[in-house]
């Protein structure tokens, strides 16, 4: 028999008091994969998000209600954009009866690109992360993008009679936002400052262009972060950032790496 006596009330263990009086800064669920739709300049894009959701737990409360995090994802099926993401964060705090919390979602984001010479179109994928958090009554939203590019070594070009070593590089930008910033705009900041950008599909004339473009635009890893930092510094939609560049060196079994961090509110 599965009949439940309506007079029987199941105990809410999570809401019971805790005598240890130790607050928990972040408690929740991690690595929840859920379908999402993304609102992009090209229209609605289906994707799959990996969510981390957590809240602050007061010292006098035994536990949080873990099921409510997944219930939130089930309820929030509107296309994901910055405005709806902020609303999701507010709803999580209300549902979990919490004063502070955090949502992080990572998903593949596809941009249609046109090859530089042949004009053929193809998609290129980027790893994008949205993070929203409320602490001490203040809300903050972060946009992170990992952008693959090509880098070509200036030293190798200078000392060689012909050719220069080049490699794929990853530019990672994690920016705190003061206004709406499309993913495409952030991606272009990195691609336009690289030795050359990448495409999913290239024909032979395009490959010639890419090779020559990189050769004419050599950059050290230091050049990459400095040039991109100038773009981030000039954009009023960005109030703080962590900018990383990693070159997967083709002549070494290690990477070259550089980081620039800045908070415009304190300098």
Curated annotation (Swiss-Prot):
Pathway: Cofactor biosynthesis; 7,8-dihydroneopterin triphosphate biosynthesis; 7,8-dihydroneopterin triphosphate from GTP: step 1/1
Coiled coil: none
Site label May be catalytically important, positions: 153
Family that this chain belongs to: Belongs to the GTP cyclohydrolase IV family.
Name of the molecule in the record: GTP cyclohydrolase FolE2
Enzyme Commission number(s): 3.5.4.16
Gene: folE2
Annotated Gene3D superfamilies: Urate Oxidase (3.10.270.10)
Reaction(s) this enzyme catalyzes, per UniProt: GTP + H2O = 7,8-dihydroneopterin 3'-triphosphate + formate + H(+)
Summary of the function given for this chain in its UniProt record: Converts GTP to 7,8-dihydroneopterin triphosphate.
UniProt enzyme class: hydrolase
Keywords: Hydrolase
Family annotation (InterPro entries): GTP_cyclohydrolase_FolE2, GTP_cyclohydrolase_FolE2/MptA
Any Pfam family the entry gives: GCHY-1
Gene Ontology biological-process entries: tetrahydrofolate biosynthetic process
Highest taxon listed in the record's lineage: Bacteria
A GO term, aspect molecular function: GTP cyclohydrolase I activity
């Amino acid at each position: 028999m599965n009949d439940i006596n309506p007079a029987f009330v199941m105990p809410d263990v999570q809401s019971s008091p805790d005598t240890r009086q130790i607050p928990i800064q972040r408690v929740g669920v991690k690595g929840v994969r859920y379908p999402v739709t993304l609102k992009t300049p090209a229209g609605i894009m289906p994707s799959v998000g990996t969510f981390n959701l957590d809240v602050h737990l007061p010292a006098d409360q035994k536990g949080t209600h873990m099921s409510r995090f997944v219930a939130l994802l089930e309820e929030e099926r509107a296309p994901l954009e910055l405005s709806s993401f902020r609303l999701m964060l507010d709803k999580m705090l209300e549902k979990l009866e919490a004063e502070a919390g955090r949502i992080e979602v990572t998903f593949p984001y596809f941009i249609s690109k046109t090859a530089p010479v042949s004009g053929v179109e193809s998609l290129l994928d980027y790893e994008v992360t949205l993070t929203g958090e409320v602490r001490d009554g203040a809300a903050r939203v972060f946009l992170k993008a990992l952008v693959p590019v090509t880098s070509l070594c200036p030293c190798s070009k200078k000392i060689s009679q012909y050719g220069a070593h080049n490699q794929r590089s990853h530019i990672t930008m994690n920016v705190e936002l003061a206004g709406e910033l499309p993913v495409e705009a952030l991606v272009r900041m990195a691609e336009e400052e690289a030795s050359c950008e990448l495409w999913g599909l290239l024909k032979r004339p395009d490959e010639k262009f890419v090779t020559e473009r990189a050769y004419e635009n050599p950059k050290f890893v230091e050049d990459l972060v400095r040039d991109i930092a100038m773009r981030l510094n000039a954009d009023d939609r960005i109030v703080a950032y962590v900018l990383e560049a990693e070159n997967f060196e083709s002549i070494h079994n290690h990477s070259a790496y550089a980081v620039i961090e800045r908070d415009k509110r304190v300098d």
